Amino acid sequence: MNEIDRGFMREAFQQALISYNEGGLPIGAVMVENGAIISAGHNRRVQDGDPTAHGEMDCLRKAGRRTRYDGVTLYTTLSPCMMCSGTVLQFGIKKVVIGEDRNFPGNIELLRSHGVEVVLLDDPECIALMRRFIAERPELWDEDIAGRENV
């Protein structure tokens, strides 16, 4: 992990902590363009009662309308689900940096097969926070993508 990726992943991790402290799923994301964060978000599925309010989706919504996303890098603490991966592909995001895929393998190969550069950091803090959440709140984890194939 280079220092630039480490710094932006720390910001995504801070977003995950916000969600965790609000009683939600600890998944955070930031969008970076030209070395600066243009948007930050976290999973709000529990807080908003919205099953589509994943961390990556919240981050994208906060970025607002844009004509192009090809110069944007998305940092996310957990490997993206099918919905979030599809959104990355739909909007042409060319690079995704992932904190961890141990607690949920996500769709790394799907992204790569469509030409997205994927960097997997295997970040110990991201892994530990998600493991802690799953142990503490398995019923919330099981509501969504947990244990399902191809999501």
Sequence positions of predicted segments:
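Active-site phosphate/pyrophosphate-handling residues
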Residues: G7, A36, D58
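Short secondary-structure junction motifs
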Residues: E22-P26, Y69-G71
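Secretory/periplasmic and organellar redox-cofactor proteins
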Residues: M1-E3, F13, A128-V151
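Short, basic/aromatic recognition patches
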Residues: M1-E22
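Short glycine- and Lys/Arg-enriched binding-loop motifs that mark or flank ligand-binding interfaces
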Residues: S19, G24, I37, M82
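Zn2+-dependent cytidine deaminase-like catalytic core
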Residues: S39-R131
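Short beta-strand scaffold segments in enzyme catalytic cores
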Residues: I27-G35
